[in-house]
Amino acid sequence: GAVTKHISSAHPYCPELRKIAIQVGKDLGITTHEKGTVVVIQGPRFSTVAESRWFSKMGWDVINMTQYPEVYLARELGICYANIALITDYDAGLEGRDDIEPVTEEAVLKVFAENNEKVKNMLFEVIKRIDLENSNCTCCNVDLSGLDL
């Protein structure tokens, strides 16, 4: 039968890439949050008010559709991976805040368009700062023995 491996995803993102991305964001004057907890929903769709309320009560900071399964697949293959989340909206709105509307596709696309250059510049700078020669990264130390790759 097929051989499977269980790879730890306790720390799914590469610590070295995260440090670089955080520093680049700060250096470029981009509002940068050094940590947070993301909840991944299956898209493409937006959350209901009930889901949004639950996510907030659970302490999750960001609702996202695109970090999983990519992060786990990268971990399985021993590939360094970090995520740069562009915050576009307040999901289904904020309770008690009539001035904040629930998300729309148009609003998300507008924020993406407004930040496209910032994200491109950030990615190019992150790539420039990756130092493969002096890396202490252990992402590639995944035991893939026994797998027919």
Question: Residues of each region from the PLM?
Answer:
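Membrane-interfacial helix-loop-helix connectors in multipass membrane proteins
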Residues: 101-103
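Glycine-rich phosphate- or other oxyanion-binding loops that anchor nucleotides, phosphorylated ligands
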Residues: 1-95, 106-117, 122-130, 134-149
